[in-house]
Design a protein with these regions (language model features):
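Hydrophobic alpha-helical transmembrane segments of multi-pass integral membrane proteins
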Residues: 1-274
Length: 276
């Protein structure tokens, strides 16, 4: 299970995060610096936990923290600080930094609140994908469709992600509330992404939206079943199915789809060069 979690994090740090930043048009960092931070993060999670492993993961944490602080400063300096989009961008930056922080905790081998090592690692995965990748997709959809539904998705995501984490760390009663909130929000985002796939004729977005709907229904069903003592799916199998659907089906396909759409749109906007 650890190997799967590390593999999904590799996808996040090398592909999902830079692709999400590019799709949103937000400042990241130079490609060489990003590759160095991502590589050392991978090495830090692959060696024996300890101080050296922690040191190897710190470049990625600092890169994510820099991005998160940058979005926060932009929000505070913005004349439209109370608009949903800059708030969402800041939240995505914060969630990414939190995910990197949990990766550092996993590398150190620390077990806060007595968590199992795999739970610490999966929390890092949660914030990279449910935190950053989900947010990037929600923000991108809202840029095309500013309406109540995209607003509900943005707010539900910003509330649901910390609620799930809070439920895991404090109260088993909060966890299903957070899971259902995030699952409902995810299902709505999935439908909006499918709708956008029809508009743009994008198979990538169609796969992304359908994968998210499936993953969110699975997550909500699992959380509710656990709460009421009905164990129809073990944790390892749920994490594998849910994680793969979210990582590859939703996040990767969705961000590739938006990247391709943006590239096509930019070509259409290029002025024609007419020879005299």
């Amino acid at each position: 299970m650890r190997e799967v979690a590390v593999g999904v994090l590799v996808l996040a740090v090398f592909v999902i995060v830079p692709l999400g930043q590019r799709v949103l048009g937000l400042d990241g960092q130079p490609a060489s610096a990003h590759r160095f931070a991502a590589f050392t993060f991978l090495v830090g999670l692959s060696v024996c936990p300890g101080v050296i492993a922690l040191a190897l993961t710190l470049p990625w944490f600092f890169a994510c923290a820099r991005f998160g602080v940058g979005r926060g400063v932009h929000l505070l300096r913005s004349a439209v600080a109370f608009r949903l989009e800059p708030v969402s961008e800041a939240a995505a930056g914060v969630f990414l930094a939190v995910g990197a922080g949990w990766g550092c905790i996993a590398a150190l081998g620390w077990r806060p609140l007595g968590f199992a090592p795999i739970t610490v690692l999966l929390t890092a995965v949660h914030f990279h994908f449910a935190g950053f990748a989900f947010g990037a997709m929600a923000i991108r959809v809202r840029r095309e469709r500013v309406n109540r539904w995209t607003a509900v998705v943005a707010v539900g995501w910003m509330v649901g992600v910390p609620l799930v984490a809070l439920g895991i760390t404090t109260s088993s009663l909060i966890e299903p509330i957070g899971a259902v909130t995030l699952a409902t929000t995810g299902g709505l985002l999935g439908l909006l992404v499918v709708e956008r796939s029809v508009r743009h004729r994008s198979g990538w977005l169609a796969v992304s939206g359908a994968s998210l709907c499936f993953a969110m229904v699975l997550a909500a069903g699992y959380a509710l079943a656990q709460q009421f003592g009905f164990r129809w799916l073990d944790l390892e199998m749920m994490e594998r199915i849910h994680g793969m659907a979210n990582a590859f089906g939703f996040a990767l396909c969705g961000l590739i789809g938006w990247s391709r759409i943006d590239r096509i749109m930019s070509r259409k906007d290029e002025p024609l060069c007419v020879s005299p």
